[in-house]
A protein has these predicted regions:
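Hydrophobic structural segments
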Residues: 1-105
Length: 105
């Protein structure tokens, strides 16, 4: 049985709280940079990367939650053959969760 090695690219960036578009671009740039260096199978981002951390009361705004989800959807298209693990908030009913999304298109 042949074992396949999995490479993980860990992204250490400093997303700005509330800057969804800027943080999305920061994520895309990090993926591009890591792809050129080592082409990892998995790109691993930090907690609440999409919104920046800590989002505090911004997390209660529906427009921020909607923008976060849209950013995650866009991120799915960036590197469809790889896995992207990234933190973002998700609303389910009246609850808001601190999620780690595992993305692959």
């Amino acid at each position: 049985m042949t074992k396949k090695k999995i490479s993980i690219g860990i992204v250490q960036e400093n997303p700005i709280v509330g800057d969804i578009e800027g943080n999305l671009q920061l994520a895309i740039n990090a993926i591009d940079k890591l792809s050129k260096q080592s082409s990892p199978d998995i790109f691993l981002f930090t907690e609440m990367f999409i919104t920046g951390y800590p989002p505090e009361d911004l997390i209660l705004r529906d427009d921020l939650l909607d923008a976060s989800y849209e950013a995650v959807e866009k991120l799915c298209e960036v590197k469809p053959e790889s896995f992207i693990v990234i933190g973002y908030p998700k609303k389910e009913g009246d609850s808001i969760f601190n999620c780690a999304g595992v993305l692959r298109n």
